[in-house]
C-alpha cells in the first residue's frame, strides 16, 4: 500500500514542479488552452503565493512529507497530512472557480492526486484499525512469512 502512496506522491510532485517552473517563467504556459483553462493566469495571480512562497513549492513540500510518512507507515500522521493537503487544495479550487474564474490543468491534476491520497489514507487507517492487519500478520506467521510491524 505504501508504494501506491509513493507513486501518487511522485505524480503530485511532478505536476507541482511543473507549476513551480511555470510560476517563475515568462514564457506562455504549455497548458494555456483557452480563456477558461490558463495555467499562466493562475500561476501568476496574487493567489499563487502565500507570504512570498509559491503555492507550488508548498505542494512539493506537502507531497514530500506525505511520501515520508507513507514509507514510515505513520498512518495517523499520514491521514492528518493528507486531510490538510485536501483542505488546502479545496481552498485553492475555490479561488480558481469563484475568484479567478480560470482553471489550471496542473492544479486540477494535483487536486485529483491529493484526493486519491486522502481516500487511500482513510482506507489504510480503517483497514488497520479493523484488525485486518493483525489477522494478516498471524496468517503470515503461520506460513513462515514475516512482515515488519505496522504492515
What is the role of each PLM region?
Residues 1-149:
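Membrane-interfacial helix-loop segments of redox and metal-homeostasis proteins
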Amino acid at each position: 500500500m505504501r508504494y501506491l502512496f509513493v507513486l501518487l506522491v511522485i505524480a503530485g510532485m511532478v505536476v507541482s514542479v511543473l507549476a513551480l517552473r511555470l510560476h517563475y517563467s515568462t514564457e506562455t504556459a504549455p497548458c494555456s488552452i483557452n480563456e477558461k483553462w490558463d495555467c499562466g493566469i493562475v500561476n501568476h495571480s496574487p493567489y499563487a503565493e502565500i507570504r512570498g512562497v509559491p503555492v507550488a513549492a508548498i505542494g512539493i513540500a506537502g507531497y514530500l512529507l506525505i511520501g515520508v510518512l507513507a514509507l514510515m507507515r505513520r498512518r495517523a500522521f499520514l491521514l492528518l497530512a493528507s486531510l490538510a493537503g485536501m483542505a488546502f487544495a479545496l481552498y485553492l479550487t475555490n479561488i480558481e472557480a469563484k475568484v479567478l474564474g480560470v482553471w489550471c490543468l496542473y492544479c486540477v491534476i494535483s487536486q485529483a492526486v491529493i484526493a486519491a491520497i486522502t481516500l487511500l489514507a482513510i482506507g489504510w487507517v480503517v483497514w488497520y484499525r479493523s484488525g485486518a492487519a493483525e489477522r494478516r500478520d498471524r496468517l503470515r506467521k503461520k506460513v513462515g512469512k514475516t512482515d515488519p510491524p505496522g504492515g
